[in-house]
Amino acid sequence: MKFVLLFGVLLVTLFSYSSAEMLDDFDQADEDELLSLIEKEEARKDCIPKHHECTSNKHGCCRGHLFKYKCQCTTVVTQSGEETERCFCGTPPHHKAAELVVGFGKKIFG
């Protein structure tokens, strides 16, 4: 009987220790996930929205619904006759087509 009681106490102790370790791991994972979300939110605040100028930061465009916007550049001739490059964040045509197909698929299949 003493052996069963000792074994039971040992089992309860090990179980409580392992569950405490698991809870610590979950808490650490929650903290890491929260920090990751905060960092992503900060990066989102610093990104350049759609149709805004990205000439100085060509890799800083925000994310769209499915894809990240791309910095699209064109050459513009000013009134003085000088050619300059102007860029804006936008959705490339192949991304627009993919978003259209996905949207159409969602409407059909729910």
From Swiss-Prot:
PROSITE patterns: SPIDER_CSTX. One of its GO terms (cellular component) is extracellular region. Residues 1-20 form the signal peptide. Pfam families: Toxin_35 (PF10530). Expressed by the venom gland. Disulfide bonds join 47-62, 54-71, 61-89, 73-87. GO terms for molecular function: toxin activity. Keywords: Disulfide bond, Knottin, Secreted, Signal, Toxin. Belongs to the neurotoxin 19 (CSTX) family. 03 subfamily. The presence of a 'disulfide through disulfide knot' structurally defines this protein as a knottin. This is U1-lycotoxin-Ls1ii. It comes from Lycosa singoriensis.
